[in-house]
Design a protein with these regions (language model features):
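Short, well-ordered loop/turn sites that connect or cap secondary structure elements
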Residues: 120-121, 140
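Ferredoxin-like alpha/beta domains used as RNA- or RNAP-binding modules
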Residues: 1-108, 112, 134-209
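Short, intrinsically disordered, mixed-charge
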Residues: 107, 122-123
Length: 209
């Protein structure tokens, strides 16, 4: 799985930070081999086709959030249905993806990667407004309180979390109590702050074909 994540970054030509701390270390496969995996073919001149470019953008954002094709397509299609009803469909799509519980756990620093965050959510490590939630796709809402279950805080995975969070900066729409290991949603995700690694308009074009 980890090897495949490294190949994903190399294939898409950019670091997507899919493996947490390793991505920031010299061991990062993209740093060592910043080219696509497999036999290296002679590159042809010219730009990639519109279809290939939009496909690459779609793959990049999908992999960044760690979603399956079915999951990602559903988010895009549902967002496209809101065309003309919302001010910015790109912001709408990113907002929904950012508000997934697994992504929020990652953004808060409670997990080192979205993959790890998804596993922790699935194993019911967290409470939303005092109630256990184990659905990674759960959409957090404004004023939701997100906390690690008290008896889970002693687990090895959280042993150094309080110290690690001292250096953590969270998105402006989240408020983090670094001592209590508790957070609250205080706003909405901001597209400019998220800085997605893909051109959203091309993704909409891909699924509109």
């Amino acid at each position: 799985m980890q090897y495949d994540q490294c190949k994903t970054c190399r294939r898409l030509g950019q670091k997507l930070f899919l493996k947490g701390d390793r991505c920031f270390s010299p061991k990062c496969a993209f740093v060592k081999r910043a080219f696509a995996p497999g036999p290296q073919k002679k590159r042809r001149g010219g730009s990639p086709s519109e279809y290939k470019k939009s496909l690459e953008e779609k793959q990049t954002l999908k992999k960044w959030y760690g979603l399956s094709e079915r999951q990602f397509k559903r988010y895009v299609k549902e967002t496209l249905e809101k065309m003309g009803k919302v001010q910015d469909v790109s912001a709408e799509l990113i907002g929904r993806l950012e508000k997934r519980l697994d992504n929020v756990i990652f953004r808060l620093g409670f997990a080192k990667s979205r993959v790890q965050a998804r596993q922790l959510v699935s194993h019911s490590y967290f409470l939303i407004n005092g109630k256990p939630v184990n659905i990674p796709s759960y959409q957090v809402q404004k004023d939701d309180v997100i906390a690690i279950k008290e008896h889970k805080k002693a687990k090895g995975i959280f042993k150094e979390l309080a110290n690690e969070l001292k250096r953590k900066e969270v998105p402006v729409w989240l408020s983090l109590n670094k001592e209590k290991l508790e957070a609250k949603t205080i706003g909405e995700p901001n597209l400019d702050e998220v800085k997605p690694p893909a051109e959203i308009s091309l993704i909409f074009e891909f699924y509109s074909r």
